[in-house]
Swiss-Prot record:
Keywords recorded for this protein, A-Z: Magnesium, Metal-binding, Oxidoreductase, Thiamine pyrophosphate
Subunit composition and interactions: Heteromer of E1 alpha (BkdA) and beta (BkdB) subunits. Part of the BCKADH complex, consisting of multiple copies of BkdA/BkdB (E1), BkdC (E2) and Lpd (E3).
Residues bound to Mg(2+): 171, 200
UniProt cofactor(s): Mg(2+); thiamine diphosphate
Signal sequence range: none
Lineage: Bacteria, Bacillati, Actinomycetota, Actinomycetes, Mycobacteriales
The reaction(s) this protein catalyses: N(6)-[(R)-lipoyl]-L-lysyl-[protein] + 3-methyl-2-oxobutanoate + H(+) = N(6)-[(R)-S(8)-2-methylpropanoyldihydrolipoyl]-L-lysyl-[protein] + CO2
Cysteine pairs bridged by disulfides in the record: none
Protein name, entry field: 3-methyl-2-oxobutanoate dehydrogenase subunit alpha
Function: Component of the branched-chain alpha-ketoacid dehydrogenase (BCKADH) complex, that catalyzes the overall conversion of branched-chain alpha-ketoacids to acyl-CoA and CO(2).
Binding site for substrate: 100
Keyword Magnesium: yes
Enzyme class: oxidoreductase
Amino acid sequence: MGEGSRRPSGMLMSVDLEPVQLVGPDGTPTAERRYHRDLPEETLRWLYEMMVVTRELDTEFVNLQRQGELALYTPCRGQEAAQVGAAACLRKTDWLFPQYRELGVYLVRGIPPGHVGVAWRGTWHGGLQFTTKCCAPMSVPIGTQTLHAVGAAMAAQRLDEDSVTVAFLGDGATSEGDVHEALNFAAVFTTPCVFYVQNNQWAISMPVSRQTAAPSIAHKAIGYGMPGIRVDGNDVLACYAVMAEAAARARAGDGPTLIEAVTYRLGPHTTADDPTRYRSQEEVDRWATLDPIPRYRTYLQDQGLWSQRLEEQVTARAKHVRSELRDAVFDAPDFDVDEVFTTVYAEITPGLQAQREQLRAELARTD
């Protein structure tokens, strides 16, 4: 076998169509024991807080876009458990490579909501400040971040770092050539990388049934020679446990894993989208009954971990961060157009200097 392509022993070459589920739709624990984890009560409550805060901020982002403060936004309503659960189990030194709908991931990683806001507003480096938290800038081109994730994982291998990279992507991205290359390369070179697909059923107006002829997205892992697993993306504890196992596997040198988190986008693809043109209200209502936040609240109640005081504290926290977001967006300084040219290379090139002067002249002419 070629150098750098060690195969882990005992690799599972089958995928269970039934998603891993620890908390049922009614909020009661399931019989699943393999992935069960005894998390501290503080962590269990914190997961709930992060899901609620994510939803509140998501609502505020939509409001800001409707008020003309943001040109566009990609709502994540309904996907809070898939994002919060997956990000919560990772180490702060694990690198994250998100697409454009990962608000819950950013918040769990400790990125201030205002930083996310100005990134969407386009007034501060396009999100490059995320790198202070080991989180790459959000990727708007579909699937390109998966290549970067694999490259970062290979760098960690070469530097003998004890870190894992996670590529966050959607079901639509799995049809992109970049994602194929990333999956293949990651498996061949046994990189410490996890591919986390949030299957929210729709790639804009394209249903997942037209994305693949495979039984599921997770089944694609078999062809690449890596484990694939499906998880209930509306079950925050299941998402936490499945990601934790995949990250531990990668950290141990056993290579990548493809996770399919089965969830649903309750809102539009973006604030410029009208989902009523391609999906029924009946479908949305059906998935709304599986809303991850009420489900997890019921679970906490049954475990004696929820109280009205906790709810009031979480609500107050959510309102506070909403206010912080609005202040950050409204107070954001105007964008310095020079940064378009000065943040590309360590030293600006002659070609970029010429382009900068052309833009300056055009702006002066139109003032």
